[in-house]
């Protein structure tokens, strides 16, 4: 073979190898890029919903919001899934179909809601199917649809986004539950609203601040006692503990009883954290969106703890003696006071008065000394 032919074959071989390597490199890169992109999008599916008797849940009224129809009387109600997880619409009436995909953290609608509405939606999810599935009544479908109904009310302004979360328009509720229809959804809906309304409520005698004015325990002949009644009816959701082990706390119904066998210098703080629905600390609320499709949210997050505080004081007693004398000499006289671990000598003042402070309740003896 001639030298020129050998050179030509080598050049062709090198070119072929380069092309093969380029192809391998391309193939090795593409799957990674595809996986990364897919993880940022969720695929939508739907399922029909059923009540406790196995009946298909249907809309009762044709209704619209801002000129967009979101329900048709007699239409079967469906629920949304995003990659198999429960999802909730935040754009009622906007188109969304099985097989559509939405991008994670790309919902303009969610971003434009503002913090108050976003927090209210999360609270509805927490007291709704996402955070309280086990405590709500009804079928899973009824719980999910009740949660969806509350979310629609919040995002559209048909329910206020701050406590007490008052409803301003019943169109979404009536579309499903008018005239007592779909009672299972209505029951779960009312439970969700009740949870939201009372979420931040603390006992009537407590404060959300640590520096509230102290309340005083009174001596009843055996111990210091203070009984407080919670007119808000939420005491059962709080377990108060004392900053001083000598101060005991007990609860019976809506009454909190605080006791101490002895007086204590300074204030004692009682504190409690409310029992509210919680989810995993890693749980997140995620919004998915697409400019041409209906935006949704999935998941739920924990809210800030609801805390209550109560300051109390347990005052010491005192003894006051006023010395009188026929000769008018009352100043500078000495008396010994004993009892309850006290053995103290005191001297009368110019007006014949002795006052001993910070004494525990009990019996004391006084006698003059020379």
Label for each model-derived stretch:
Residues 13, 26-35:
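C-terminal segment of classical bacterial N-terminal signal peptides
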Residues 38-198:
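Short, surface-exposed polybasic-aromatic patches that bind anionic ligands, especially phosphate groups
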Residues 159-315:
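Acidic/charged, solvent-exposed loop-and-adjacent secondary-structure segments enriched in E/D, K/R, S/T
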Residues 228-232, 320-331:
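Structural motif
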Residues 255-257, 351-358:
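Short, surface-exposed beta-strand/beta-hairpin micro-motifs centered on an aromatic residue
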Residues 263-265, 354-365:
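Short Pro-Gly-centered beta-turn/loop motif in secreted/extracellular proteins
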Residues 268-274, 362-370:
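A short, solvent-exposed beta-strand micro-motif common in secreted/extracellular proteins
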Residues 340-355:
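Short, acidic Ser/Thr/Gly-rich low-complexity loop/linker segments typical of extracellular
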